[in-house]
């Protein structure tokens, strides 16, 4: 019986690994509206990372939205978006619509189903061209996992209502272009980070060794935007996060042994949008998240939490707290 259970566990693990495997493809689209004809349904279903060059239109975006169920990363930074008019674009219910050239179409990655707007939940990162002029209405509305929108353009494109959510998506832009974006209408509340987004997972085998592990990976703490830490953390490690990681957008420390987050650890982290807390956390120190104004949505507090010290969430006006039970 034990052998059979082990075999079943192995097969389940293998199937899970296969389901999450990265499948990267690059296509040159010579004629707008023909993307889907360049691959089989099976290929479209398997792609997680897609790079497109050439010419696209609203028909192609509709297919990207509706027929690529595993799509996580889309790079259209070297593609040109052509004008299209008709009923086969992205607008809900097949409405006739005129889609302008180099505009990310309205409802590009969202759709209205039974009166409710639903975004593409698999989409995590999109890279847009320097030619982009507009990001149209509801283009990425409801894309709750779109953590990165990287725009190659040095001046901000026009952002239309509900096109992007500032509580979900960090905007990565060319060096020296922050002011051009920050003062543009509807861009004011987004987190802008200049340069390339950097994501990493660090495993820490001994207390106080986070810095060593980051250096071993050939990284600098200040450059990290999306960080997952697994293993052991102590106060020295939290001090490193506090003092030398100003550009954190997302942090997952759920699989660490930490039971206390020291005072002021994440205070004034102006780009921080999301955090996952340690499963066995007991104490959140004074002003730990003070003035993390972009931290939004629901923060899940493990049931093990017994103390939240003064001002821990001061200035986190967009944050909701939720007590959860985590099964070991």
Predicted regions and their residues:
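Structural signature of tandem-repeat unit edges
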Residues: 23-31, 48-56, 71-87, 91-103, ...
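A structural signal for leucine-rich repeat
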Residues: 64-67, 88-92, 162-165, 241-243, ...
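Consensus positions within tandem repeat domains that build extended binding/scaffold surfaces
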Residues: 107-108, 136-139, 264, 285-288, ...
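Flexible, charged surface loops at secondary-structure boundaries
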Residues: 39-47, 67-68, 164-166, 216-224, ...
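A short acidic, amphipathic alpha-helical/loop segment
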Residues: 60-67, 138-139, 237-241
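A short, well-structured beta->alpha microelement
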Residues: 26-39, 203-216
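Bacterial Sec-dependent N-terminal signal peptides
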Residues: 1-24
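Helix-loop-beta element that forms the nucleotide-linked donor phosphate-binding surface
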Residues: 184-189
């Amino acid at each position: 019986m034990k052998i059979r259970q082990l075999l079943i566990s192995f097969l389940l693990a293998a199937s899970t690994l296969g389901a999450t495997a990265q499948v990267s493809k690059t296509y040159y689209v010579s004629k707008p509206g023909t993307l889907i004809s360049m691959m089989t349904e099976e290929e479209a279903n398997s792609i997680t990372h897609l790079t497109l060059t050439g010419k696209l239109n609203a028909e192609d975006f509709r297919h990207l939205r509706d027929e690529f169920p595993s799509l996580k990363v889309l790079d259209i930074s070297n593609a040109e978006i052509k004008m299209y008019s008709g009923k086969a674009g992205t607008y809900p219910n097949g409405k006739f619509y005129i889609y302008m050239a180099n505009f990310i179409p309205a409802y590009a990655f969202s759709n209205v189903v039974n009166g409710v707007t639903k975004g593409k939940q698999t989409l995590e990162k999109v890279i847009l061209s320097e030619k982009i002029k507009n990001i149209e209405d509801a283009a990425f509305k409801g894309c709750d996992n779109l953590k990165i929108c990287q725009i190659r353009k040095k001046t901000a494109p026009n952002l239309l209502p509900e096109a992007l959510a500032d509580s979900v998506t960090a905007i990565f832009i060319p060096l020296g272009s922050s002011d051009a974006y920050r003062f543009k209408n509807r861009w004011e509340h987004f987190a802008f980070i200049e340069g390339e987004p950097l994501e990493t997972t660090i495993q820490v085998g001994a207390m106080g060794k986070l810095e060593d592990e980051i250096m071993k990976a050939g990284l600098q703490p200040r450059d990290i935007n999306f960080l997952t830490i697994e293993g052991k953390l102590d106060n020295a490690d939290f001090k490193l996060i506090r003092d030398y990681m100003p550009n954190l957008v997302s942090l997952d420390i759920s699989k660490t042994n930490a039971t206390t987050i020291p005072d002021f650890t994440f205070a004034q982290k102006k780009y921080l949008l999301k955090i996952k807390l340690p499963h066995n956390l007991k104490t959140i120190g004074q002003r730990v998240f003070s003035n993390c104004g972009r931290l939004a949505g629901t923060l899940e507090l493990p049931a093990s939490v017994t103390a939240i010290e003064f001002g821990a969430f001061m200035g986190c006006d967009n944050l909701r707290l939720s007590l959860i039970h985590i099964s070991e």
